[in-house]
């Protein structure tokens, strides 16, 4: 089915498509399906160099070969300074960001995001909205700003610029199992969204983490094993990596509150101590708002506030 979705996308746009390639295992599988399983070699791989990748990921990308590299206009520190820190999830950070803006402008009473954070939003039947997230209301009083803008500024915008300049449409390796928002998008639009404002193909939407690991294991394809380690199976036949499970942005805090210890930051302290020191240390209070400084990004204070151990 994945191959069919890719071929439909490729044919619809007369081959003017590209593969969004992060160097992670999911997009590595997607690129292998396009090139080696389907035998389509005129689909370029495009990598966004955000500066937030593990060194091992960047090294792997360089070894892949013909990869187009694009870069954002702002670095992570600049995004934090202007918009805020990425915490809990994209959805929660966005709600906190816009609710705080509504509060500052004195219009929070009927503001949707504020009401959801207070647990007051209702659906069309007058029932409590499933999107209420009062658990995170305390972030409205955090000594730092929250935002999900980093994903847009550092990943999506460089890709959109590439799309505008090249005329090519994206194929991405996101999966519905990764988040509620991605699942909802897939259920509404399917794998290929031809008619949206930004047409996009997500041919692996119905895959799971196990599917990805099984593909790599079975097809014996090259992947960033320096960071993931080996792919093995346990007694029940479940696949797992011996090192990192996910390799997104190194300093991202989305989802870290859900992880068992050692969590991503505790593992980072062992595997990449210099990166750990830079992201955890530093930070300064500027007019009541916590911001990065010359010593580091100051994530330690943020993680303390949301109750995530990083030591």
Question: Over which residues does each language-model region extend?
Answer:
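ATP/NTP-dependent adenylation/nucleotidyl-transfer catalytic domains that generate, transfer
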Residues: 197, 208-311
């Amino acid at each position: 089915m994945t191959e069919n979705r890719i071929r439909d996308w490729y044919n619809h746009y007369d081959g003017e498509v590209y593969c969004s390639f992060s160097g992670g295992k999911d997009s590595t599988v997607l690129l292998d399906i396009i090139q080696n399983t389907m035998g389509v070699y005129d689909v370029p791989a495009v990598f966004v160099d955000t500066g937030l990748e593990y060194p091992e990921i960047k090294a792997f990308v360089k070894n892949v070969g013909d990869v187009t590299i694009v870069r954002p206009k702002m670095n992570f520190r600049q995004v934090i300074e202007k918009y805020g820190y990425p915490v809990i999830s994209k959805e929660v950070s966005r709600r906190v960001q816009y609710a705080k803006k509504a509060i500052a402008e004195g219009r929070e009473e009927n503001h949707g995001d504020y009401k959801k954070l207070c647990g007051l939003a209702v659906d069309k039947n007058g029932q409590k909205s499933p999107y209420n997230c009062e658990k995170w209301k305390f972030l409205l009083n955090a000594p730092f700003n929250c935002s999900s803008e980093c994903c847009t500024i550092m990943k999506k915008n460089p890709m959109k610029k590439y799309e505008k300049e090249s005329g090519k449409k994206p194929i991405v390796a996101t999966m519905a199992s990764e988040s509620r928002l991605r699942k909802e998008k897939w259920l509404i639009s399917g794998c290929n969204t031809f008619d949206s404002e930004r047409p996009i193909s997500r041919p692996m939407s119905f895959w799971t983490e196990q599917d990805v690991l099984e593909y790599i294991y079975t097809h014996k394809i090259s992947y960033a094993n320096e960071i993931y380690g080996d792919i093995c199976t346990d007694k029940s036949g479940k696949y797992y990596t011996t090192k990192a499970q996910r390799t997104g942005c190194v300093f991202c805090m989305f989802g870290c509150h859900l992880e068992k210890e050692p969590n991503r930051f505790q593992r980072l302290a062992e595997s990449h101590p210099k990166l750990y020191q830079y992201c955890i240390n530093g930070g300064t209070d500027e007019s009541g708002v916590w911001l990065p400084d010359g010593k580091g990004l100051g994530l330690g204070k943020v993680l303390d506030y949301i109750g995530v151990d990083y030591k």
